[in-house]
């Protein structure tokens, strides 16, 4: 990539997953692709902030809302291109070489999902996520997104909703979303804890309720309060 990019990571008690995510970004630092790293924390009570400060990130703190945290992070970025990652989603080795040299500023890019777990269930859920993204132009936040700030501004900036912020963004971008041939590995911890089928059904139920008109605020209150 000929231009530098900023990386934005929203965090909340991410001490166990953040270090490995940051490690995968090092090749971008060494290649001169990453201009700055912005970590926006939602009130962690573990070592997340210390980890962020140790690597020289621009650190800010706000109320816990992933959409709001990402919005604040994008605002603090110094580069025109922004790579938004979840704290538990890691880019595969060699990702720098597969990023387009001159990405289209009128397009947004996402990655191919896989889980850090073996087995049929993990492969099935990841396959569905990648098909959903391709067929319906609906990648989720754990697939990462590379977007130009001008494009983001043209669609009303990053959604600040407490839930479904990634779906709102994807629906605004539509067919301007392009899949990159780069794997991104996300944590399977919640799926394993709750059960792959139960967690998958819950996510699908959330999506359907949102598409049928339930507000993100109401969904957040229902599922997280």
Model-flagged regions — what are they?
Residues 1-2, 171-225:
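Hydrophobic helical membrane-anchoring modules
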Residues 4-6, 36, 168:
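Cell-envelope/extracellular polymer assembly enzymes that use nucleotide-activated donors
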Residues 13-29:
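Short, well-formed alpha-helical segments that are part of the catalytic scaffolds
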Residues 16-19, 46-55:
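Acidic helix N-cap motif at the loop->helix transition within catalytic regions
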Residues 22-26, 33-43:
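Short beta-strand/loop segment that forms part of the nucleotide-sugar
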Residues 41-49, 89-90:
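A conserved acidic beta->alpha catalytic loop
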Residues 82:
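Short aromatic/hydrophobic "clamp" motif used to bind/position activated sugar donors
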Residues 93-121:
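Conserved donor NDP-sugar-binding/catalytic core segment of glycosyltransferases
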């Amino acid at each position: 990539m000929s231009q530098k990019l900023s990386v934005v990571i929203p965090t909340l008690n991410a001490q166990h997953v953040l270090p490995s995510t940051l490690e995968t970004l090092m090749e971008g630092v060494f290649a001169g692709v990453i201009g700055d790293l912005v970590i926006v924390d939602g009130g962690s009570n573990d070592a997340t902030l210390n980890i962020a400060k140790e690597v020289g990130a621009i650190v800010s703190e706000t109320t816990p809302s992933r959409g709001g945290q990402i919005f604040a992070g994008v605002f603090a970025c110094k580069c025109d291109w922004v790579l938004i990652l979840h704290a538990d989603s890691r880019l595969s080795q060699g990702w720098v070489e597969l990023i387009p040299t001159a990405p289209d500023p009128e397009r947004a890019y996402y990655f191919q999902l896989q889980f850090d777990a073996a087995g049929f269930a993990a492969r099935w859920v990841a396959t569905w996520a990648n098909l959903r993204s391709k067929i319906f132009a609906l990648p989720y936040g754990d697939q990462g997104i590379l977007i130009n700030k001008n494009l983001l501004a043209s669609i009303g900036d990053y959604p600040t909703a407490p839930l479904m912020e990634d779906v709102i963004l994807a629906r605004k971008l539509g067919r301007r979303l392009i899949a990159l041939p780069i794997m991104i590995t996300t944590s399977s911890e919640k799926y394993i804890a709750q059960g792959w089928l139960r967690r998958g059904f819950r996510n699908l139920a959330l999506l359907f309720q949102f598409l049928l008109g339930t507000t993100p605020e109401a969904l957040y209150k229902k599922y997280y309060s």
